[in-house]
Amino acid sequence: MSFQQEVSKRRTFAIISHPDAGKTTITEKVLLFGNAIQKAGTVKGRGSNQHAKSDWMEMEKERGISVTTSVMQFPYNDCLVNLLDTPGHEDFSEDTYRTLTAVDSCLMVIDAAKGVEDRTRKLMEVTRLRDTPIVTFMNKLDRDVRDPMEVLDEVESELGMACAPISWPIGCGKEFKGVYHIHRDETILYESGHGHEIQEVRIIKGLDNPELDEAVGEDLASSVREELELVIGACPEFDHELFLAGELTPVYFGTALGNFGVDHMLDGLTRWAPAPQTRQANERDVEATEEKFSGFVFKIQANMDPKHRDRIAFMRIVSGTYDQGMKMNHVRTGKNVSISDAVTFMAGDRARAEKAYAGDIIGLHNHGTIQIGDTFTQGESLKFAGIPNFAPELFRRIRLRDPLKQKQLLKGLVQLSEEGAVQVFRPLQNNDLIVGAVGVLQFDVVVARLKAEYNVEAIYEGVNVATARWVECDDAKKLEEFKRKSQANLALDGGDNLSYIAPTMVNLNLASERFPEVQFRATREH
């Protein structure tokens, strides 16, 4: 197969949803249909030893939430799908936001009983920045749900996207009988209890087929016909160009737990979602089909494998081909490195990557030299734009139970901050270590990982910090004056960037009024 064909068959997407909308279950079922897992793991099987394939840290296993992003690759139809699983828990935002910079499309999972929820809104704001195409799956139809038309209206009004239903539910809850596939003009009947295998489904051709009345009952059949007349009249038809521009989403209905409807959605996603896209670098736009290799690191994860005790930098290949043993240029450091041990992923199982193409995600072993946002190329000096760092919203002082382990504590915190799990600030005037996070659960993760991975027992104390900002100033003289007068509020973050730590928002506002030449930034590009 030619290089162009290899690139054009790639589909790299992430799943976004509110916690508990069924994202991990969908991930499982997508892998099942991609034959990647023969038996879909019982997710959150309380007490059972089968943990979902994509949840791998101890804490995730205990809590049944996906804490870290993992990558899974599998073939489907004539495509090769790279699925990036993003944390579903409310806290894990930074990692999730960055993952969304590494994909070409997204699958939005909505709990049809609840509609559009808060976390979905936040994630959609991020996809909006890049006009990412979105495919929608309305989940949990085997439970009692809201009126589907109402939920579609909510997606349109709250997320600003037109909805084009591709399938439509027949009943819901105990009365859920299946879906009518609008494009294929056929009804696919649902049978419950097939969570772990792909079921043989019965298909009835045509909406006016009397077999439909026999299968679902006359009342339900006639109300579905009426509903569909309304739906087809009121909803826009699927338009591929609007979809690619992020303005319209195809909508599928089903139940991931009941293993139903996921394959219809995958058919649509592989057919319509874009192959690897052109990427903006600060210097120029880079086409996926360019021969020369380029890629950027969007995530670093420590200790993915208890057997290996290592850190992996996840890299999205933007253009060209990775070949085992090839030399590439690490743009930030200016060094040429030879990479012979990159890995590909299949839900926690890794394999050595011999070859990978634009659109693929590979893992590089990282011994502390690679940072989030780093670019690797075959010589050209490029920096890919738009990989964000967010100012944390919650702060704690971290203290050791054993003061002799200060060195290990600092090492652990800096490594955890490099992978984006948390941010660490070292005030210039004292030896405190302040940890900043976007959500409360991140604090628990840090203490658990410090203990498990660095053998450091740490505890938190409250600290008088309301917010932090990264400080920039083009005028060196003014910056020195600012540093002299604001010494008590200044700190260095994990990457030694100057930061301003404000005890109150009022304090921050006063500082920015007193020093108009200084910029206080709430986000920082890596």
UniProtKB/Swiss-Prot annotation:
The keyword Protein biosynthesis applies. Keywords: Cytoplasm, GTP-binding, Nucleotide-binding, Protein biosynthesis. It holds the Pfam family GTP_EFTU. Its main location: cytoplasm. It comes from the Bacteria. It is found in: Cytoplasm. The keyword Ubl conjugation does not apply. GTP binds at residues 17-24, 85-89, 139-142. Belongs to the TRAFAC class translation factor GTPase superfamily. Classic translation factor GTPase family. PrfC subfamily. This is Peptide chain release factor 3. It comes from Vibrio atlanticus (strain LGP32). The gene is prfC.
